[in-house]
Every structure is written in C-alpha cells, then in structure tokens.
Amino acid sequence: MTLILGIDPGSRITGYGVVRQTARGCEYVASGCIRTGSGELHERLQIVFRGVSEIIAQHGPVTMGIERVFMARNPDSALKLGQARGAAIVAAAEAGLEIAEYSATQVKQAVAGTGGANKEQVMLMVMHLLKLTQKPQIDASDALAIALCHAHTRSSLVPHGLATARRRGGRLRL
C-alpha cells in the first residue's frame, strides 16, 4: 500500500488529491483545494507551501505527482504558475517525498485514454476509477487525476526502476 499525493498547482487555487495504491488499484483518500486569496504573490506562495506541508503531515504520502507548467498565452500567468509549482515541490522535497512531473497530456492519456480529453471527461473517469458518488471541485479532480497518473506510471516501473532509483538514493524523473 502506497499513499500518493497529486498536485494541480495554481497561484490562486491549488488542487490536491491523495490516493492509496494497493495491489487491486487505487482508492480515494482525500481531496480539496488550497485557496490563497488575492494577497501579494509571496503571501500566496507561502499559503501554498504551508497547505501542501499540512496535507503531507496529515496523510503521510511517500510520493507526489505534479503537473508541469505549460506555456500559457500570458507569460506573467505562466511565471506565477511556475512559482506556485515551486512552492509545492519544495514542501514535498522538505518532507522527503519522491517527486515526479507530468504534462497535462500525459495525465489525460493515463486517466481518460486520450491526451485530448476535456476536463469533464477527466473528471468522469476520476469519479469512475475512484468510485466517487459526488463530483469533486475541478482543481481537486485534476489533482486526483495526476495522482492516478502517477500511480499508473509507478506500477509500470515497479519493482525494477523505482526500486533501483530508491536504492541508489536518486530521484526518479519521468
């Protein structure tokens, strides 16, 4: 059994999802959103860092998947997204989690079967795979999808690749 944290980073809303990976698949543990409000950027980044740190302390995941930054139309938005991502990554690194990064296309492919899936299709597959009866918030749904993608990728790497990386004290990069 492995607890996996998925993070959908954002400078205003960061989604998180925690799943338990077992021999039979994945089970839902928790999900939600870290809302930073509209303060100064450094204050919002601190909220993301503390929020992710609290989630890690509460649930005890051993690994984290996080979405890569995509090039947005607005360069300022892409920079802020990258900074929020960095705050989440530092929180996970401080806690000793293994960290893997995935593109949005990789996440959609792993969860919905096509890299061109829309948010609604991804959410419906997340609900189906985790046997959820209510729709999660969209950012939480995306984070759960990232956690599921990470679980799927991990299961294809175990036992050889991940075990080797862990033994050598290295970081697994996907």
Swiss-Prot record:
Cofactor note: Binds 2 Mg(2+) ion per subunit.
Record-listed Mg(2+) 2 binding positions: 67
Pfam assignment, any one: RuvC
Residues the entry annotates as binding Mg(2+) 1: 8, 139
Cofactor section: Mg(2+)
GO biological process, one term: DNA recombination
GO cellular component: a single term: cytoplasm
EC numbers on record: 3.1.21.10
Location in the cell: Cytoplasm
SUPFAM superfamilies to which the protein is assigned, alphabetical: Ribonuclease H-like
Keywords: Cytoplasm, DNA damage, DNA recombination, DNA repair, DNA-binding, Endonuclease, Hydrolase, Magnesium, Metal-binding, Nuclease
Keyword DNA-binding: yes
Catalytic residues (positions): 8, 67, 139
GO molecular function: crossover junction DNA endonuclease activity; DNA binding; magnesium ion binding
This protein's record includes keyword DNA-binding: yes
Catalytic reactions of this protein: Endonucleolytic cleavage at a junction such as a reciprocal single-stranded crossover between two homologous DNA duplexes (Holliday junction)
Leading EC class: hydrolase
Family recorded in the similarity comment: Belongs to the RuvC family.
SUBUNIT field: Homodimer which binds Holliday junction (HJ) DNA. The HJ becomes 2-fold symmetrical on binding to RuvC with unstacked arms; it has a different conformation from HJ DNA in complex with RuvA. In the full resolvosome a probable DNA-RuvA(4)-RuvB(12)-RuvC(2) complex forms which resolves the HJ.
NCBIfam families from the UniProt entry: ruvC (TIGR00228)
Chain's role: The RuvA-RuvB-RuvC complex processes Holliday junction (HJ) DNA during genetic recombination and DNA repair. Endonuclease that resolves HJ intermediates. Cleaves cruciform DNA by making single-stranded nicks across the HJ at symmetrical positions within the homologous arms, yielding a 5'-phosphate and a 3'-hydroxyl group; requires a central core of homology in the junction. The consensus cleavage sequence is 5'-(A/T)TT(C/G)-3'. Cleavage occurs on the 3'-side of the TT dinucleotide at the point of strand exchange.
UniProt-recorded name of the protein: Crossover junction endodeoxyribonuclease RuvC
Lineage: Bacteria, Pseudomonadati, Pseudomonadota, Gammaproteobacteria, Pseudomonadales
